């Protein structure tokens, strides 16, 4: 089946039924949910009703396996009453439910921003290990590095697109659009400008190792 969603910003065409879309935006959810349900595409939003008391019971109700829970080490929330969870953990619950459907493609719409950094990193690592295609709509600079390719949209125009590492080299354009560079990219850019580094870095641990060697 093929789903076509179009608004003033972009046109999204999905041909694969094994797709999960996780949204923080209820308005977008309401405009998509009926069409996607008929297309066999899973739509999950923060407003989705949870019919049980905790994540373990919800996964059983949905007849989903607990592979994702075990892989992501979700012991701290697996049996916690939903009513006791923070907004961050509730967002994590919805993402875990979406991942437990083991989609081939997952579209994340402003949802990763809700997560704690450790949880966010675990989700991305899981997706990459399972070779699940990630489409992440975000305005959070630190999330730019999660995907190999990047598209910057302003109004109804595509400003830049290409490999993320190449797009991020256009610092002036990115800042003009109101964004900052991810911290590690910004720091390595400044250090390169002053001759401390000879290239850009996109991984914090790698940059720390290089800087420690220079200090030694």
Residue ranges: model-predicted function:
Residues 66-87, 102:
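Conserved ABC nucleotide-binding domain
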């Amino acid at each position: 089946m093929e789903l076509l969603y179009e608004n003033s910003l972009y046109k999204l065409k999905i041909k694969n039924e094994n797709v999960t879309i996780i949204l923080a935006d209820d308005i977008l959810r309401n405009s998509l949910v009926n069409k996607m349900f008929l297309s066999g595409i899973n739509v999950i939003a923060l407003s989705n009703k949870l019919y049980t008391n905790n994540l373990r019971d919800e996964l059983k109700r949905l007849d989903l396996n607990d592979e994702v829970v075990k892989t992501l080490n979700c012991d701290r929330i697996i049996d916690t009453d939903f009513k006791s969870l923070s907004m961050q953990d509730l967002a994590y619950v919805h993402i875990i439910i979406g991942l437990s459907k083991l989609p081939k493609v997952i579209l994340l719409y402003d949802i990763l921003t809700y997560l704690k950094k450790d949880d966010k990193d675990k989700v991305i690592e899981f997706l990459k290990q399972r070779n699940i295609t990630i489409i992440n709509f975000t305005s959070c600079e630190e999330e730019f590095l999660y995907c190999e390719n990047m598209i910057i949209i302003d109004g109804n125009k595509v400003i830049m697109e290409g490999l993320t590492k190449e797009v991020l080299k256009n610092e002036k354009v990115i800042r003009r659009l109101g964004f900052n560079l991810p911290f590690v990219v910004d720091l390595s850019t400044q250090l390169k400008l002053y001759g401390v580094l000879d290239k850009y870095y996109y991984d914090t641990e790698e940059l720390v190792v290089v800087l420690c060697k220079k200090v030694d």
